[in-house]
A protein has these predicted regions:
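Aromatic- and carboxylate-lined catalytic core of secreted/periplasmic carbohydrate-active enzymes
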Residues: 8, 95-129, 211
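Conserved, mostly hydrophobic/aromatic
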Residues: 26, 66, 78-80, 111, ...
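Solvent-exposed beta-strand/loop surfaces of large extracellular or lumenal domains
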Residues: 177-197
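Alpha-amylase-like alpha-glycosidases and glucanotransferases acting on alpha-linked glucans and related
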Residues: 1-73, 130-134, 143, 196-199
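C-terminal beta-strand-rich structural cap/linker in extracellular carbohydrate-active enzymes
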Residues: 191-219
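Short catalytic/ligand-binding loop motif for oxyanion handling, primarily in non-cytosolic enzymes
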Residues: 28-32, 83-87, 157-159
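Short, solvent-exposed turn/loop segments enriched in Gly/Ser/Thr/Pro and often Arg
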Residues: 25, 77-85, 127-130
């Protein structure tokens, strides 16, 4: 949280809104490979090691941040299909035709649509709401839309209580889930969460994330 705030302060608003938000690129190991915490190169570990022990839950968490944080989300080809690889040149493998991770492709498509259809993610304000060990919660909002994003990057279930007055939502209101991701899959089912006394309580399983939405005037 502190690092993100510190580096954002170096950008003017126009620069921040068009900054390339990347998880992978042609110079570094692919993000999905980094979720297995193996340090090394293909020449030492072998190319297969890049795909061993990966965590798709962490990958989906990162994509949710990528698509809801200020800036221009930028995909490195193949990330959306589950392509792995250590640092250059292993990170420049060909697209995995016929072996794509179809779930990750659907997830990226849905997250891109969420980003594109909601102006608050493009030009809205951003504010941290809550931070704890392996827990991140922030809001993106404008006058019409308020979103709360909660990430559990822990290896076990966490109960989280978040003060949401900084998101500009009423002290008592309903929030609608528009994205919920876990290690295994994801859901866009419109589950309702209740805010009472400006606090939101929720339980998140390990390596999961949720995006909640409130629209001005809907309560």
């Amino acid at each position: 949280e502190n690092a993100m705030t510190h580096y954002m302060a170096s950008f003017g608003t126009p620069s921040l809104q068009c900054a390339m938000n990347q998880l992978s690129n042609h110079d570094h190991s692919r993000f999905l490979t980094r979720t297995n915490h193996k340090v090394g190169r293909a020449v030492n570990l072998g190319t297969q090691a890049a795909s061993e022990g990966i965590n798709r839950g962490v990958m989906k968490e990162a994509v949710i941040v990528q698509m809801t944080w200020p800036g221009a989300p930028t995909l490195y080809y193949g990330d959306e299909a589950g392509l792995c690889g250590f640092t250059d040149p292993d990170n420049r493998r060909t697209y995995p035709w016929g072996k794509e991770d179809k779930m990750l492709i659907r997830f990226h498509r849905d997250m891109i649509r969420i980003h594109r259809e909601n102006p608050a993610f493009c030009t809205g304000s951003v504010k941290f709401l809550h931070g704890d060990r392996n827990i991140l919660c922030y809001t993106r909002f404008n006058r019409e839309q308020q979103f709360i994003i909660v990430i559990n990057n822990d290896g076990y279930t966490r109960n989280v209580e978040v003060g949401v007055c900084g998101a500009g939502v009423p002290k008592a209101c309903k929030l609608t889930q528009i994205m919920y991701s876990t290690e295994e899959n994801y859901s866009m089912a419109p589950v309702t969460y209740q805010v009472e006394g400006s606090y939101l309580s929720l339980t998140l399983p390990k390596y999961s994330a949720v995006i909640l939405r409130h629209l001005t005037g809907e309560d």
